[in-house]
């Protein structure tokens, strides 16, 4: 292998996104006063909250899939997910204000996996390293720049700024152009999403590694060059 550039996803690859999402969602509802004592009682409030959270996760997941397909833009995604739960659960909140508060809380959520910092330090010692993410710009910059991995990242590439989302090959071509890499065999994309990271890397003609930390079954027909189930396994590949 003759890699010079490692492109790597952020959420569920380097950072634990479910933990980030859970903390941000709960803190948003706390700040909005949802858990203030009422005649419903704490147990009932918690039960309702869990139902709202579960529904939000389903709505949000589908919207991000739609984003990858180009069926929705990110500005709309940020608000419509809250519009849906506000309507379905008859909540008395403004979806735009709720979205802004939630994004602020997301930006405070820094939960790297145990091996993340060591991995980034190792990669930085051998290669140029770029994070490539479809995440929301203000959220991702806040999380990365306030984390211990910031000093090991040469470039943060966010779809908001490039104008296209993974799996569009142009975001990977943008990264290669930034690092002045012409030979595609010198580049590898590492990430947890088969549909965004692996398919995107393949669209761009570069090697790929699927980070399958949750032991998911791959029934997509999208086959990565490598698969790891622990971040530590990347040391053996790279």
What does each of the following model-derived ranges do?
Residues 126-127, 205:
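Glycine-centered short loops/turns at secondary-structure junctions
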Residues 2-114:
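N-terminal helical cap/lid subdomain that shapes the substrate entry/recognition surface
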Residues 127-130, 183-185:
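Short beta-strand/loop segments at the ligand-binding rim of alpha/beta enzyme cores
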Residues 115-126:
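Catalytic-core regions built around general acid/base machinery
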Residues 1-6, 18-19, 121, 136-238:
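Asp-based, Mg2+/Mn2+-dependent phosphohydrolase catalytic module
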Residues 133:
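Conserved phosphate-coupling serine/threonine residues in phosphotransfer and NTP-handling enzymes
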């Amino acid at each position: 292998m003759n890699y010079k550039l490692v492109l790597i996803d952020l959420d569920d690859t380097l950072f634990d996104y479910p933990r980030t999402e859970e903390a941000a969602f709960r803190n948003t509802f706390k700040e909005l006063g949802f858990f203030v004592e009422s005649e419903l009682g704490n147990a009932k409030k918690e039960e309702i909250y869990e139902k709202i959270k579960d529904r939000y996760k389903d709505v949000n997941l589908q919207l991000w899939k739609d984003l990858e397909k180009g069926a929705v833009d990110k500005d709309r995604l940020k608000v419509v997910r809250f519009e849906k739960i506000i309507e379905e659960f008859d909540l008395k909140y403004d979806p735009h204000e709720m979205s802004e508060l939630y994004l602020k809380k997301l930006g405070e959520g820094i939960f790297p996996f145990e091996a993340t910092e060591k991995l980034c330090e190792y990669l930085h010692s051998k290669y140029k390293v770029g994070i490539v993410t479809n995440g929301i710009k203000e959220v991702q910059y806040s999380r990365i720049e306030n984390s211990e991995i910031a000093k090991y990242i040469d470039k943060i590439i966010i779809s908001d700024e490039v104008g296209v989302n993974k799996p569009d090959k142009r975001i990977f071509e943008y990264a290669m152009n930034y690092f002045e890499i012409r030979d595609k065999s010198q580049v590898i994309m590492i990430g947890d999403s088969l549909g965004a990271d692996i398919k995107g890397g393949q669209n761009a003609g570069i090697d790929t590694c699927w980070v399958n930390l949750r032991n998911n079954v791959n029934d997509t027909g999208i086959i990565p060059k490598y698969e790891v189930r622990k971040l530590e396994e990347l040391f053996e590949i790279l």
